[in-house]
């Protein structure tokens, strides 16, 4: 920025580093300088891409300052297709943190889904919103739709089992975990979760011990298992 102060990209890089260092006022000043220079770029694609990154950094600064409405407003300015989905998901998260969960869900639902993968990403983002808001029953039901789109995905099924537990459906959780183990005998997280849920209930304690030992056998160094 000192050697070539009229080039926009170094200002954007400097702002990025300043945000990482929590030098927010300095980052904001760098972004203002970048924006002034970027708006003069003749290439529309380069200008748009640069401004998108600047808006994302502005949103990050506002979020660090707990100004969630301001952060959401910056994200709303992004219309770059490459960044649109991620930006809208962040917007939805900020709306939910402000107690506007229904608005957040509507925003996710309004996103275009040109492919089945897009639809899965939308549902996954909405499930995460509900999980963060502790709306476990709704999250569990929506996760069921996600599983239906990819019924052979054991990771999705495991997440559904965990949400079933949060929503108070202990028997469903057990059924789903046993289904995963039957389909993928080395899925150690399922052994661990099922073992501990049985132990917590004080039932089938011998099976619970065997399940946990099996989990450790498959993943001896997994800190999640050794800590649980």
Q: What function would you assign to each model-found segment?
A:
Residues 1-228:
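Alpha-solenoid helical repeat scaffolds
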């Amino acid at each position: 920025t000192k050697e070539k102060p009229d080039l926009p990209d170094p200002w954007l890089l400097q702002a990025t580093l300043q945000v990482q260092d929590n030098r927010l006022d300095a980052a904001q000043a760098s972004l203002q300088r970048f924006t002034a220079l970027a708006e003069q770029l003749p290439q529309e694609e380069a200008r748009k891409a640069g401004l998108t990154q600047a808006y994302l950094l502005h949103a990050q600064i506002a979020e660090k300052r707990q100004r969630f409405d301001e952060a959401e407003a910056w994200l709303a300015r992004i219309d770059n297709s490459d960044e649109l989905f991620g930006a809208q998901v962040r917007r939805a998260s900020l709306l939910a943190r402000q107690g506007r969960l229904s608005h957040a869900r509507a925003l996710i639902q309004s996103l275009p889904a040109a492919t089945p993968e897009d639809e899965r990403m939308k549902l996954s983002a909405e499930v995460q919103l509900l999980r963060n808001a502790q709306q476990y029953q709704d999250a569990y039901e929506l996760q069921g739709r996600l599983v239906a789109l990819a019924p052979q995905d054991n990771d999705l099924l495991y997440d559904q089992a965990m949400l079933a537990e949060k929503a108070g459906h202990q028997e469903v959780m057990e059924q789903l975990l046993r289904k995963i183990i039957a389909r993928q005998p080395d899925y150690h997280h399922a052994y661990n979760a099922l073992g501990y849920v049985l132990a917590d209930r004080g039932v089938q304690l011998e099976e619970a011990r065997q399940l946990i030992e099996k989990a450790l056998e498959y993943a001896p160094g997994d800190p999640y298992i050794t800590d649980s």
